[in-house]
């Protein structure tokens, strides 16, 4: 039975309400309007049930794959307290704006990026905000940023099922989510949490991506399961979703990230990786 809404409940407070998925107020359309200078065709959330699975890496990999195939792409970095997307692309400095809104920063490959790190005086300054404030900033990245014409906007979300994922699902017109995981013992329970949240919010799950799936020996080519054997296929079958890819641990990719040159990743990593191409193909084929 649905939870009764608390006294003083209103649609505006849903982003931080424990009963947002079940009360009558939550069923209203709370979608925030996009900036008038934004024409975004598809919004894809990249989520995970827990941290440490390389979600930002998968987000950037999906974005690079789309750019490589000629699409216009943006990344909304919704991981407010742990942003990493700008640094991966070598994007520094401050975002600028006008009366019409904020301009996203543009990486060397044309990827448009907005992140809280682009608004801080110093990149190393911590963001010590409570949940509702963080959720409000994420919404503003949609309403106040002039994204322009985009084929895909990828939303890199913080791990878990808290305020930010709830805000994104309620406030942005999310067309689908990709769930990122890794081969560990508790993976099934964690994946199911993310999956169940998306389903409760009526967001389509495009599929699962397993990161850190294996390490390929540079001498013999043998695939080594560093973090244990993969269970992603069984989990996907149980949930009735696709396995979009199994991404390996690749020292070359780590080096690109360290050099802040992810805009070159198509030449050094993605170009010959059929797994990542398959992920991109799946995202396109759903529409």
Language-model features, listed with the residues they occupy:
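C-terminal lobe/tail of nucleotide-utilizing enzymes
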Residues: 2-28, 197-278
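Walker A/P-loop phosphate-binding motif and the immediately C-terminal alpha-helix
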Residues: 37, 42-80, 195
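Phosphate-binding loop that captures ATP/GTP phosphates
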Residues: 72-73, 78-123, 128, 135
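Pre-Walker A adenine-sensing motif
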Residues: 29-37
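Inter-motif core of Ras-like GTPase G domains
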Residues: 146, 165-186
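Residue-level signature of catalytic and energy-coupling elements of molecular machines
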Residues: 40, 51, 77, 85, ...
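Phosphate-binding/switch loop-helix module in NTP-utilizing enzymes
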Residues: 120-168
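Single conserved hydrophobic/aromatic residue that forms the stacking wall/gate
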Residues: 275-287
